[in-house]
Amino acid sequence: QAARMPVFPAGDSERNATLTHLSGALTWIFGPLIVHSSTRPGSLLRREAAKAFNYQLIAGGVFVAAAIVFGILGLGNLMGLVWLGWLGLTIAGAVKAGNGQDWTNPLTKFTKVTPLDPSGR
């Protein structure tokens, strides 16, 4: 039987990057922004904080747009699907960061909106 790779390696940077992505679920853009502002330029944690911030900002816009469109069309019940998509991509970003993978969120790729430089500068 092959050895299992841990979902979250023991490194502090990866663990903190994971928590930074997950902080977006509780603090929206503010948790990732605080982490980004308080870390060294070029560090893994700063890069992941920028990615988390950018995604949460875009997702906030998607929530507002979806609420307006679904409200006009009388499809407010579909907001639950938008929320599930947001939660899934937030968790995916956290897992990828925890595994040390340089992953770009599909929503960020699609919109190309990056107010914070994802290279960590």
Question: Residue spans of the language-model regions?
Answer:
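N-terminal leader/transit sequences and adjacent low-complexity N-terminal tails
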Residues: 1-7
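Short, Lys/Arg-rich cytosolic juxtamembrane segment immediately N-terminal
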Residues: 8-19, 53
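Hydrophobic, aromatic-rich membrane-embedded alpha-helical segments
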Residues: 14-41, 68-88, 108-118
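Amphipathic, cytosolic membrane-interfacial segments at TM-TM junctions
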Residues: 40-62, 95-107
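Hydrophobic alpha-helical transmembrane segments and immediately flanking/interface helices
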Residues: 81-102
